[in-house]
């Protein structure tokens, strides 16, 4: 089951305290006006996917082609755009906004982003090499990686040999991070542990591929329009219930008033009969 992921901005790290007193380090991810920009269908494009856009970009900083692309979708220019493969039945309408309730507490997700660049790094920093000895004939090369191969045969350095070189600034995916808490009102997703990238960087969040698909996942996505409709329905139901309660209270009050009036009428009738009997008795005595 494939459904859309989300584009989020890395706000930073903090900690959350649980009810049992334990503290969990979390990374705060924010969904900033995450909307569907385009659809990819099997009939037209050969595959099924949704294209999402997040953030807000200035129109003058957006190319003319992308301005037309966003105008066709009737959305504001977006800062970040990404595609997510989905099943055909999980396509989302263009212009729909996805909320943080797309994921739930306890769910496992995969977060991908661009790692922090370290520049040109040595083998000890880049590959955790131990380095050479501090003495016993070693000079200058204490932090070098040592030999890079064999002799005349094969007479070359094999591809993939761990050596010094550029470190970081690469696409990295951290798998099986657990969602600790979500805040739909502020668009926040808090995941346990660290995610690639620096503060303010963009990351993509997907359902974990190495975990079973959650049964209570919202399909095709947690949409803001659906939440608003549910809220309106709840308000209408609450208003109807309040109206019914008010009508029932009014009916009960009317019944009570009628009962009181009937009791007063019966009491008045009893008094009238008693007065008549007393008058007759008085006349008989006279």
Curated annotation (Swiss-Prot):
The keyword Ribosomal protein applies. Methylated by PrmB. Keywords: Methylation, Ribonucleoprotein, Ribosomal protein, RNA-binding, rRNA-binding. The modification N5-methylglutamine is found at residue 152. SUPFAM superfamilies: Translation proteins. One of its GO terms (cellular component) is cytosolic large ribosomal subunit. One of its GO terms (molecular function) is structural constituent of ribosome. Residues 246-286 are annotated as: Disordered. InterPro entries: Ribosomal_uL3 (IPR000597), Ribosomal_uL3_bac/org-type (IPR019927), Transl_B-barrel_sf (IPR009000). Residues 266-286 have a biased composition (Basic and acidic residues). GO terms for biological process: translation. Residues 246-265 have a biased composition (Low complexity). It holds the Pfam family Ribosomal_L3. Belongs to the universal ribosomal protein uL3 family. Part of the 50S ribosomal subunit. Forms a cluster with proteins L14 and L19. NCBIfam families: L3_bact. One of the primary rRNA binding proteins, it binds directly near the 3'-end of the 23S rRNA, where it nucleates assembly of the 50S subunit. This is Large ribosomal subunit protein uL3. It comes from Roseobacter denitrificans (strain ATCC 33942 / OCh 114) (Erythrobacter sp. (strain OCh 114)).
